[in-house]
A protein has these predicted regions:
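Active-site-proximal beta-alpha core segment in soluble small-molecule metabolic enzymes
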Residues: 21, 25-28, 33-36, 43, ...
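Active-site anion/phosphate-binding pocket segments in diverse small-molecule metabolic enzymes
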Residues: 2-35, 86-87, 106, 124-132, ...
C-alpha cells in the first residue's frame, strides 16, 4: 500500500511539473463537473432511460478520451456518440469498451474495421445497407446499426412514411445487420416554444408504432432527446437520451431553463502576461491601429491569439481577468498575441496569471458571454480551441492527466 501511495505521489508530482511548463496557455478541464452534470441529468430522466454522452469533436474541445474513460463505469451510461469513424476508433484504441454510435454518414472504406470494433453506424441510405451487409459477411460478425429518421431537421435520415417503412424492411432483409436503435434529431428543442419539437416527437413515435405493427420489428434503443430535450421535454426520454453540450456544463441556449438541471461549466482557460508597458496619448495598439490611446495607458501582452482558437472577433470587445478584475482587449487580436488595458488594475506585472475563460475571484467569464461578444455561440467557442492548447484534467482537485497535442504531432 505504501509503495502504491509513493507511486501515486510521484505521478502527481510529474503531472504538476508538466503543467507548470505551460506558461503560454493551457485549458483546465474539471472532470468532477462533468461527472456531476451527468448525475444531475440522470436525476431528471426516467430511471430506465440510459444516457449517450456525445463526445464528438474531441469532446467539444474538452478531450473525448479522458471523459469517456471517467464515465465508462457509470451504470446509466449506454455509451458514446461520435461524428466520424476516426473519432470512434481513437476511443477504441484508448480502451473504451461501451457502445459508440456514429451520428453522421460513415464512409465505406472503414466498414470492416467498424464492425470488428463494434462501432454502430447511422443508416439511412440503401447503398450503405448493402455495403455494410457485405462487410459483415467478410468479417463474420453482425453490424449493429441505428436507423436515422428525418422528422424535420432536413439534414440526413429517412422520412417517417411509406418510403421510410420500405427502407426499414430493406434492412430486415439483410441478415448481416442488426437494428439496435432508431433515432431522430430535434431542430428547435432549444427554443421556448416547443411546438416544432413536439410535432417532430409525434412523427417519430407514430413511425415507430408503424414499424412495430406493420413490420413486427421491436427496436430496443429508441432515442430523440438532445441536451435541450433532456432539460425540458421529459416526454421525449424514450430508451436513451443524447447528452451533448450539457455534458460539459453549458446550456443549449438562453431560452432553455437553467433551473431544472444544475450544470457546472467544466473548462477554464489561462495564460500569463509576457510584457507590460505604458503607451502615451496618440499611440496605437495592434494591426490597423484600431485603438489609439487618449491618455497614458498601461498595456499588457497576452501570448494567445486566433491561432489558438481565441476569436479575432473579440478585438476591441472582449476582456480577460487579471487579479480578479476585468482587463479589456485593446485593438485587434493577432494570430499569437493580443493586448489588454491594465491601467485600472494595480500592481500588474509580467508573469501574472490571466483568466481567459472561467473565474478569478468574484468575476467570471463564461463561454456564453464570449460567444455573444464574438458573434458566435458557446458550442463554437469551446469546440474551436486549438491543438496548441494543452488540456489539464483535474479530479478531486488533483491533476490526473495532461493532454499535450505537441507530443503526438
Amino acid at each position: 500500500m505504501e509503495v502504491n501511495v509513493r507511486k501515486c505521489e510521484k505521478m502527481t508530482g510529474k503531472l504538476q511539473e508538466k503543467m507548470n511548463s505551460y506558461q503560454r496557455v493551457w485549458a483546465e478541464v474539471d472532470l468532477d463537473a462533468i461527472w456531476e452534470n451527468m448525475v444531475h441529468m440522470k436525476e431528471n430522466i426516467a430511471p430506465e432511460t440510459k444516457i449517450l454522452a456525445v463526445i464528438k469533436t474531441d469532446g467539444y474541445g474538452h478531450g473525448g478520451v479522458p471523459i469517456a474513460r471517467m464515465l465508462e463505469n457509470l451504470d446509466f451510461m449506454f455509451g458514446y456518440a461520435a461524428a466520424t469513424y476516426e473519432e470512434a476508433h481513437v476511443l477504441r484504441e484508448a480502451g473504451v469498451k461501451k457502445p459508440i454510435l456514429i451520428l453522421g454518414y460513415t464512409f465505406p472504406y472503414c466498414y470492416e474495421e467498424l464492425i470488428r470494433e463494434e462501432v454502430r453506424p447511422a443508416v439511412y441510405r440503401r447503398d450503405t445497407v448493402e455495403e455494410l451487409a457485405e462487410a459483415a459477411v467478410k468479417v463474420g460478425k453482425k453490424a449493429r446499426v441505428h436507423i436515422k429518421v428525418d422528422t424535420g431537421m432536413g439534414r440526413i435520415g429517412i422520412t417517417p412514411d411509406d418510403e421510410g417503412l420500405q427502407f426499414v424492411k430493406f434492412i430486415m432483409e439483410h441478415p448481416g445487420l442488426e437494428v439496435e436503435g432508431i433515432f431522430t434529431h430535434f431542430a428547435k428543442s432549444d427554443e421556448a416554444d416547443k411546438t416544432s419539437a413536439n410535432r417532430q416527437l409525434e412523427l417519430f413515435q407514430n413511425f415507430i408504432h408503424r414499424i412495430q405493427s406493420e413490420l413486427g420489428l421491436d427496436i430496443p434503443v429508441k432515442h430523440c432527446s438532445n441536451s435541450a430535450a433532456i432539460l425540458e421535454m421529459p416526454q421525449a426520454n424514450m430508451d436513451m437520451v443524447r447528452a451533448g453540450i450539457t455534458t460539459y456544463g453549458l446550456y443549449p441556449s438562453e431560452e432553455v431553463s437553467k433551473d431544472i438541471v444544475p450544470l457546472r461549466a467544466a473548462m477554464s482557460l489561462y495564460s500569463h502576461i509576457v510584457y507590460c508597458k505604458t503607451i502615451h496619448a496618440g499611440q496605437s495598439v495592434s494591426y490597423g491601429g484600431l485603438f489609439t490611446a487618449k491618455k497614458d495607458t498601461r498595456v499588457a501582452t497576452i501570448p494567445v491569439g486566433y491561432g489558438d482558437g481565441y476569436p479575432r472577433s473579440l478585438s476591441g470587445k472582449g476582456y480577460v481577468l487579471i487579479h480578479g478584475k476585468k482587463a479589456p482587449i485593446l485593438g485587434r487580436v493577432c494570430m499569437d498575441q493580443f493586448m489588454v488595458d491594465v491601467s485600472e488594475i494595480p500592481g500588474v506585472m509580467e508573469g501574472d496569471k490571466v483568466t481567459l475563460l472561467g473565474a478569478d475571484g468574484p468575476e467570471r467569464i463564461t463561454a456564453e458571454e464570449l460567444g455573444e461578444l464574438s458573434g458566435r455561440f458557446n458550442y463554437e467557442f469551446v469546440c474551436t480551441l486549438g491543438k496548441r492548447i494543452p488540456r489539464v484534467y483535474r479530479r478531486n482537485g488533483e491533476i490526473t492527466e495532461v493532454k499535450d497535442y505537441f507530443e503526438n504531432f
